[in-house]
């Protein structure tokens, strides 16, 4: 399964969208490759894009964005505990600069973002969603990035986690994600059908806490 990050470009004119990311199974050592230096040049406003914006956003000069600010490195809080930073933040700030409006990032529970877009609390949702039929029925999504679902363990995989056979292991996952709602339940069923111990699933709404559970050893692995 793929978790696809979605970004509203032309679709921003609908004021009903949410963004995403997800994927296939893998478990591998991290790669500390060099990161290219980012450009600091300011994007030029595109009047054709500005014309596509709803009047309410154009007049305000600001677009309000709901995000789960616990998902490093895509969207998370800076050291001040207030400012939302990350890869998606930099990207969407640059996109909206082309529309000539500023961004207002509002931290939200992951499973409340789409509801917030539907209710008008947010103009846009930018976070780590999987694009699927259920969500496409609720919000406009435009894919721009694909990444595989990752199994993450402590360094060296000390519990010898095998994604294809995690029966009897403790696995942490964020609430409301496809990993929590689809992936792990399917794996759980495979375990019970085979007469093996169930996966002990730890669910938390805060991705930072999910990560901490692996770091502390409370969980053997996590899915992201």
Residue ranges of each PLM-predicted region?
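Acidic, polar ligand-binding/catalytic clefts
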Residues: 102-164
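C-terminal motif of bacterial Sec signal peptides marking the signal peptidase cleavage site
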Residues: 17-21
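Short, hydrophobic alpha-helical packing/hinge segments within bilobed ligand-binding/sensory domains
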Residues: 91-92, 113-114, 207-213, 219
């Amino acid at each position: 399964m793929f978790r696809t990050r979605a970004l509203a470009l032309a679709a921003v004119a609908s004021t009903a969208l949410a963004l995403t990311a997800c994927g296939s199974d893998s478990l591998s050592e991290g790669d500390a490759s060099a990161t290219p230096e980012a450009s600091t040049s300011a994007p030029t406003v595109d009047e054709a894009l500005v014309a596509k914006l709803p009047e309410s956003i154009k007049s305000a000069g600001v677009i309000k964005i709901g995000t789960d600010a616990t998902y490093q490195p895509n969207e998370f809080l800076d050291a001040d505990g207030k400012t939302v930073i990350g890869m998606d933040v930099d990207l969407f700030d640059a996109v909206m600069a082309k529309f000539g409006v500023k961004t207002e990032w509002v931290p939200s529970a992951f499973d409340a973002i789409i509801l917030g877009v539907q209710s008008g609390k947010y103009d846009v949702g930018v976070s780590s969603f999987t694009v699927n039929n259920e969500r496409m029925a609720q919000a406009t999504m435009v894919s721009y990035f694909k990444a595989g679902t990752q199994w993450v363990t402590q360094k060296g995989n000390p519990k010898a986690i095998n994604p294809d056979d995690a029966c009897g292991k403790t696995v942490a996952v964020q609430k409301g994600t496809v990993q929590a709602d689809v992936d792990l339940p399917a794996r759980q069923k495979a375990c019970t059908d085979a007469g093996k111990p169930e996966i002990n699933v730890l669910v938390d709404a805060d991705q930072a806490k999910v990560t901490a559970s692996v770091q502390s050893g409370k969980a053997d692995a996590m899915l992201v």
